[in-house]
Amino acid sequence: MGYGLPAAMGAKVAFPEKTVLVFSGDGSILMNCQELAPLSQYGIAVKVIVLHNDTLGMIVQLQDFFYNKHYTQCTLNSRKNLPMLAGSMGVRGYHIEREDDLFPVLREALACEGAALIDIAISKDERVYPTVPGGKALCDMILGGEAR
């Protein structure tokens, strides 16, 4: 958690002619949101797509699988306004609530010069697959549904 944005910045600096997207959860982006400032300051045109569900999604998913859905310390509920935060650092910010707005906003954000942050509201029940449990090998990955 928290690795995606700095890694995307490095990729964009290394390959400035390429379009670089980073997909991040809202919990992950909060771990390094200060990195939005250098995007603007140094003209690093990364497009940041935030899947915003007010949870630490990886933690929730692990608690689903291995702790019988006994959730603790994984809800954010901080009323954060990520597009406003991005704007305060010179990065264009967007917010998507409705599925119908997804493609028009993505087209606009991808076409804009410079960095952009697209904050997409998703359900707290969304999960990310595949996932590899800690300490396990790729052959132990979970492709969806319940843990093996």
Task: Please annotate each region the language model reported.
Residues 1-148:
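Thiamine diphosphate
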